[in-house]
């Protein structure tokens, strides 16, 4: 592997490429749309319920982890589809594993959300 010199221009381009990836994720991936819709609801609810700094940290980390995992999953699926457009059992397992990782993070994020939001919602009725 070639050692390249540090270049500000290259660093700027890397952010540009990453930004394009984020735009592609939220504009073309249906599952990411769902995650974004939930994100908006959670942020609004958090603002209305007055989350603490640490609660916001947990929420933001969960949101970021799920969206990042969805991005990696989408990239793996796109690469698998390009490499093997026809059905392949190994490709199926690879895609299932990537999707499973997103599911695990999403479920854990729901649990974190329940731990944070349920007590706050219940306190509104007491």
Predicted regions located by residue number:
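Hydrophobic alpha-helical transmembrane segments
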Residues: 2-75, 83, 87-89, 95, ...
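Active-site-proximal acidic segments at structured loop/helix or strand boundaries
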Residues: 80
């Amino acid at each position: 592997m070639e050692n390249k010199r540090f270049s500000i221009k290259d660093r700027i381009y890397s952010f540009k490429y990453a930004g394009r990836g984020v735009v592609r994720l939220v504009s073309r991936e249906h599952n990411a749309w769902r995650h974004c819709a939930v994100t908006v609801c959670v942020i609004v609810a958090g603002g209305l319920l007055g989350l603490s700094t640490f609660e916001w940290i947990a929420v933001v980390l969960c949101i970021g982890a799920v969206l990042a995992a969805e991005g990696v999953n989408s990239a793996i699926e796109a690469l698998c589809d390009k490499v093997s457009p026809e059905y392949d059992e190994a490709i199926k397992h690879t895609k299932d594993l990537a999707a499973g990782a997103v599911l695990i993070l999403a479920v854990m994020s729901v649990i974190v959300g329940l731990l944070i939001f349920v007590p706050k919602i219940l306190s509104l009725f007491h």
